[in-house]
A protein has these predicted regions:
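Conserved NAD(P)+-binding/catalytic subdomain of aldehyde/semialdehyde dehydrogenases
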Residues: 177-255, 259-264
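Short acidic-hydrophobic, aromatic-tinged amphipathic segments that line or gate anion-handling sites
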Residues: 2-8, 180-185, 305-310
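Short internal beta-strands
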Residues: 151-161, 265-271, 278
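N-terminal Rossmann-like NAD(P)+-binding subdomain of aldehyde/semialdehyde dehydrogenases
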Residues: 1-121
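A glycine- and small/hydrophobic-rich beta-loop-beta segment
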Residues: 259, 267-343
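Conserved small-residue-rich beta-alpha loop and adjacent elements
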Residues: 106-171
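C-terminal core of ALDH-fold dehydrogenases
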Residues: 320-426
Length: 426
């Protein structure tokens, strides 16, 4: 059930939710730092050693051969293949609109200023292994990179107990245009992508979710390479009016609660009656879920509700929390969209469940968490590009404007800067 709190306590709620960020303890950071250093020095040998140690699999090589890749794909269910093809179309349709070109500005006296938009050359995608397998994450990470124009997109994922990869992951990688797959996970995979080994070339950026050791590794290699984010636990906030269907609201709250005992599920509503019905539905629906224990722990610790005086007040509180997923389960949701300032992704209306965005709708499901939607964005084509400016001044232009450059440089006491302009004005 959701614990009701009062509007006056919203600041405490916000701090409580933000405290769920992964605690990268000193012990974890030291362990991961040692793994990274080992991979930097010993490369493939270290990677294979850690695969044996952590995944209990002895491999001769990390790279997935084309034969193995194709063989795994053949094991996929036809209905899964159909669903993934449609999801890919939707994701591509949405992300293609994000692609932008550069520009050129021409001014008087032979001055040209421009900006080039260039794709990164190589990107590494981390895909978790273990019991869970997330082919949707492969599409969400790889397709924007390919649309951006990244030529080399590689994927790392831990091998299973048989030393291979899950068929659904293999198919998703092929569908998304991944160029190579390597059977390696954990901090050692992040280190290999960041620094390179005999088998794995270094990349420019690493994206994708992982456990606390993967998160620590991403944090430690940031600066050597770029990363997407250090993601916290999943979160959903539902704004619902009195006409919202309690069954729908409960189902959507549970869709995030089942992720993790630290996942948060928040309901902001104008109806005390709806809150009561939602709590009844949560008990009913959670009782039959395979991950019942995780759901119960999540709701006990991070399932909260506030009854507000208006939808505007609900959205105002939501803006302070800045949730990863925001659902506006209200009448005329488009009219209220402009009031939303901070949210990773917004789901409008009674029928737009958050799962649509997770798998199929086309918007990206790699979203800012832990309140970072106040200043950061979902993964997109922009995540895989860099912008470079260029400038051209003619002889006429430097003679006309060089004195101003010299004046500013001299005021900053950087005489060599001033001289660089001065010598061209002779």
């Amino acid at each position: 059930m959701l614990t009701r709190i009062y509007k006056e306590d919203k600041d405490a709620l916000k701090e409580y939710l933000m405290s769920r960020t992964q605690d990268l303890s000193t012990d974890v950071l030291v362990t991961v730092s040692n793994i990274i250093q080992d991979v930097k020095e010993n490369k493939d040998e270290a990677c294979l050693k850690y695969t044996q140690q952590f995944d209990k699999v002895s491999l001769d090589t990390m790279e997935v051969s084309q034969e193995e890749w194709d063989a795994q794909i053949l094991k996929c269910d036809d209905s899964f293949v159909e669903a993934m093809k449609l999801a890919k179309e939707n994701i591509e349709d949405f992300h293609k609109l994000q692609k932008k070109g550069g520009y050129l500005l021409q001014k008087e006296k032979g001055i040209y200023l421009g900006q080039r938009v260039l794709p990164l050359e190589a990107v590494g995608i981390y895909v978790p292994g273990g019991r869970a397998q997330y082919p949707s994450s492969v599409l969400m990470n790889a397709l924007p990179a390919k649309i951006a124009g990244v030529q080399n997109v590689v994927m790392v994922t831990p091998p299973d107990k048989n030393g291979t990869i899950h068929p659904n992951i293999a198919y998703a990688a092929k569908l998304a245009g991944v160029d190579k797959i390597y059977k390696i996970g954990g901090a050692q995979a992040i280190a290999a992508l960041a620094y390179g080994t005999q088998t794995i070339d270094r990349v420019d950026k690493i994206v994708g979710p992982g456990n606390i050791y993967v998160a620590a590794a991403k944090k430690l290699v940031y600066g050597t390479v770029d990363i997407d984010m250090i993601a916290g636990p999943s979160e959903i906030l539902v704004v619902a009016d009195e006409k919202a269907n309690a069954e729908y609201v409960a189902a959507d709250l549970l869709s995030q609660a089942e992720h993790d005992p630290m996942a948060s599920a928040i309901l902001l509503t104008t109806s005390k009656g709806l809150l009561d019905l939602v709590n009844q539905e949560l008990l009913k629906q959670s009782a039959v879920l395979p991950k019942k224990e995780i759901v119960e722990q999540s709701l006990k610790n991070y399932g909260k509700a506030i009854v507000c005086d208006s939808i505007e007040e609900c959205i105002s509180i939501s803006n302070e929390i800045a949730p990863e997923h925001l659902e506006l389960m209200i009448q005329n949701p488009m009219e209220h969209l402009q009031e939303v300032k901070n949210a990773g992704s917004v789901f409008l209306g009674y029928y737009t469940c958050e799962s649509i965005g997770d798998y199929f709708g086309g918007t990206n499901h790699v979203l800012p968490t832990s309140g970072t939607a106040r200043f950061s964005s979902a993964l997109s084509v922009d995540s895989f590009i860099k912008k470079s400016s260029y400038l051209y001044y003619s002889n006429q232009a430097i003679k006309a404007y060089g004195k101003y450059i010299e004046t500013i440089a001299s005021e900053e006491h950087l005489q060599a800067h001033a001289n660089a302009a001065k010598v061209r004005m002779k």
